[in-house]
């Protein structure tokens, strides 16, 4: 009886829905019956909107599923559901409210609702105290905006939504404002809304009185695109087999020439895939897209000075201000005295504060302002009463600050710091050497003669610029090396023809011919030729090459290598005791942001005390798994096998058994040979 009831169409909505989708005109009467039933349920719901109604929820989902089949009857249905939600969303039953939202999402996926009005309604629903609903709406909003901008940027919809979000960020409801901010941040990270307007709307959240909103906005601006790119690269590299997987597969399989060839082929394919260049993402960091960074930084500093938030939030504010000042080269002179208050060795997170001081330094800041900052670091950190680690951190911070603002360093302070080159602590000694090495390239004249080292081409060409002076060149420095190399290549081509003709004659002998790659010798000859040229002639050649030809990436790589070689090669006229040094061309360029490793770099790790070593050893033991194979039985209650019983049996009971007595043992001669082989093997190892 129940089965027959389930097949009746008026009471079985899923079956009716399935049939209507197959043939809408055939079931129009059943649809109209359900539609009238839906209307009467809506009228009842309006009288008591706070009461749950399972029947109405089923009818709303049914209508949403078949709305595309009867557009003439259900043209006003989406607007009706939206009105019910917008008027009663605060008092609605949570399950019924979720059903209404799902029905609207279904209608939007069928493109039966305008996205702007629906998304505005969903943003308003963020005010509801329903975590599951907020999560569902958040996912739909991000996905829908992504689909809207999939083929091309839909600026009409984007502008309307961005303006609406700007008002939502200032909403009195903190939850709604936070969710709206999360949507904007997610859209920026997914490269959907990566324009300046989105970034400048998010800047308003940095002045929110709600801590969660403030922290979310600061975290967004402190995020780095480079890190995200590396993460995405590492995620993509995890897909598919690695070289280790292929080697393990070969080692565990059958050893044959066919399998070996398969392995080599697979390794080649893997290498080729790794070498494939991915499309570059031309995505600036959000800090670059701020319209008025000077005004933004001043407001942030004012907020920081009267901030009553936790210390971690203050650190984030300091970090953002320092990045703004360093990247945009702003004038924010009150920021440096503010940082000086925290520059004490006992200060919490002092290495990060030193990093912020270095980030906020640039060549346009007047040297007098940075000088007071340097003296504070030197007086508080680089003194003999402090430990070696504290002194090292102080010298590293001074080095990073002066690398960005060289004019701030005084000759007296530099000479004092250079004396630590012979300090007993290796970390202090090495950090002082790095500071000396920096000034050998920046301004060797400030160092004492014994610390200047052997003069190189780069140190002779180095020139100290005055405050505010620009060094504008009308040529590419180092471009003169290209023309010389071109001539050398022409000569090498002629030599190449001669060598090939010789090799053809000698090929009949069937002997191997040694081919000598003389790239190192060529580079030495090029550097000799350039050294013999006067400086004026070099500049003229570089200017001629820069204006007469289009330089390729390979040309720029050669120029960069030549400029790096200048720092190694001795100056012309001096006795060249140095050998030619090969330069690593894969060296990563230094970014515009500093890393905490630059400040905390210790060349020698400090010894850990006994308690720390014991704690690490004990932690390792707890995490370690037993290297024993667990005996697993199909039936845990079954008895042990005869084989297991044999292993566990006492030897004295097995001693006189037939199996032991009839066992084949090694003869005396076999034992002699085994001993001899073992002794020979041991002697080889001793050698």
UniProtKB/Swiss-Prot annotation:
One of its GO terms (biological process) is ribosomal large subunit biogenesis. GO terms for cellular component: nucleolus; nucleoplasm. Residues 490-512 have a biased composition (Acidic residues). Highly expressed in testis, kidney, spleen, brain and fetal tissues. Also expressed at lower level in heart, lung, liver, small intestine, ovary, uterus, mammary gland and placenta. The modification Phosphoserine is found at residues 232, 234, 236, 585, 595. It is found in: Nucleus, Nucleolus. InterPro entries: ARM-type_fold, Sda1, SDA1_C, SDA1_MD, SDA1_N. Keywords: Coiled coil, Nucleus, Phosphoprotein, Protein transport, Ribosome biogenesis, Transport. Residues 483-525, 604-669 are annotated as: Disordered. The modification Phosphothreonine is found at residue 552. Its main location: nucleus. Residues 253-315 form a coiled coil. The keyword Transport applies. The keyword Ribosomal protein does not apply. DAZL and PUM2 bind its 3'-UTR mRNA, suggesting that these proteins may regulate its translation. Required for 60S pre-ribosomal subunits export to the cytoplasm. Belongs to the SDA1 family. This is Protein SDA1 homolog. The lineage of its organism: Eukaryota, Metazoa, Chordata, Craniata, Vertebrata.
């Amino acid at each position: 009886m129940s089965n027959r009831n389930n097949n009746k169409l008026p009471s079985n909505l899923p079956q009716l829905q399935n049939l209507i989708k197959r043939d809408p005109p055939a079931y129009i009467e059943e649809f109209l019956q359900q539609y009238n039933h839906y209307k009467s349920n809506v009228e009842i719901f309006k009288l008591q909107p706070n009461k749950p109604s399972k029947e109405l929820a089923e009818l709303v989902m049914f209508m949403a599923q078949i709305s595309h089949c009867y557009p003439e009857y259900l043209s006003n249905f989406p607007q009706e559901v939206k009105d019910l939600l917008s008027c009663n969303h605060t008092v609605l039953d949570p399950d019924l409210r979720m059903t209404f939202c799902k029905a609207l999402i279904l209608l939007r996926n069928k493109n039966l609702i305008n996205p702007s009005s629906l998304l505005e309604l969903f943003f308003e629903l963020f005010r509801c105290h329903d975590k599951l609903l907020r999560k569902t709406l958040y996912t739909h909003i991000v996905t829908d905006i992504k689909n809207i901008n999939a083929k091309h940027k839909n600026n009409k919809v984007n502008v309307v939504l961005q303006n609406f979000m700007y008002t939502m960020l200032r909403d009195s409801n903190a939850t709604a404002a936070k969710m709206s901010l999360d949507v904007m941040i997610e859209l920026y990270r997914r490269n959907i809304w990566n324009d300046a307007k989105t970034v400048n709307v998010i800047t308003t959240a940095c002045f929110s009185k709600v801590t969660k909103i403030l922290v979310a906005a600061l975290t967004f601006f402190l995020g780095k695109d480079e890190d995200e790119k590396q993460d995405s690269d590492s995620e993509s590299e995890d897909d598919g087999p690695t070289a280790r997987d292929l080697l393990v597969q070969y080692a565990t399989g059958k050893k044959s020439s066919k399998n070996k060839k398969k392995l080599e082929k697979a390794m080649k394919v893997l290498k080729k895939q790794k070498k494939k260049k991915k499309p570059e993402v031309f995505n600036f960091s959000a800090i670059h897209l701020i319209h008025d960074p000077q005004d933004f930084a001043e407001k942030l500093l004012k907020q920081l000075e009267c901030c009553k938030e936790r210390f971690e939030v203050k650190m984030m504010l300091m970090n953002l201000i320092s990045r703004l000042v360093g990247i945009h080269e702003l004038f924010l002179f009150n920021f440096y005295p503010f940082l000086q208050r925290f520059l004490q060795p006992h200060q919490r997170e002092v290495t990060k504060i030193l990093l912020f001081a270095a980030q906020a330094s640039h060549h346009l800041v007047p040297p007098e302002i940075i000088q007071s900052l340097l003296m504070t670091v030197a007086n508080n950190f680089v003194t003999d009463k402090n430990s070696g680690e504290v002194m090292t951190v102080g010298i590293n911070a001074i080095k990073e600050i002066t690398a960005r603002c060289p004019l701030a360093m005084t000759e007296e302070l530099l000479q004092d710091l250079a004396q630590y080159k012979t300090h007993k602590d290796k970390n202090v000694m090495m950090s002082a050497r790095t500071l000396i090495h920096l000034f050998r390239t920046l301004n060797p004249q400030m160092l004492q003669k014994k610390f200047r080292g052997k003069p190189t081409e780069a140190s002779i060409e180095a020139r100290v610029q005055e405050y505010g002076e620009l060094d504008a060149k009308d040529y590419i420095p180092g471009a003169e090396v290209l023309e010389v190399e071109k001539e050398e290549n022409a000569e090498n081509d002629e030599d190449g023809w001669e060598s090939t003709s010789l090799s053809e004659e000698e090929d009949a002998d069937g002997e191997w011919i040694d081919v000598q790659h003389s790239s190192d010798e060529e580079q030495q000859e090029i550097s000799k030729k350039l050294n013999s040229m006067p400086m004026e002639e070099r500049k003229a050649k570089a200017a001629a090459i820069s204006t007469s030809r289009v330089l390729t990436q390979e040309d720029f790589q050669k120029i960069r290598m030549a400029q790096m070689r200048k720092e190694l090669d001795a100056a012309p006229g001096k006795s060249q005791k140095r050998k030619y040094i090969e330069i690593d061309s894969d060296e990563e360029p230094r970014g515009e942001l500093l890393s905490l490793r630059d400040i905390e770099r210790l060349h020698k790790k400090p010894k850990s005390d006994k308690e720390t070593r014991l704690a690490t050893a004990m932690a390792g033991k707890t995490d370690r798994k037993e290297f024993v194979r667990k005996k697993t039985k199909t039936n845990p209650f079954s008895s042990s096998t005869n084989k297991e019983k044999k292993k566990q049996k006492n030897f004295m009971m097995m001693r006189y058994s037939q199996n032991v007595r009839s066992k084949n043992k090694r003869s005396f001669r076999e034992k002699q040979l085994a001993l001899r082989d073992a002794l020979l093997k041991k002697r080889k190892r001793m050698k």
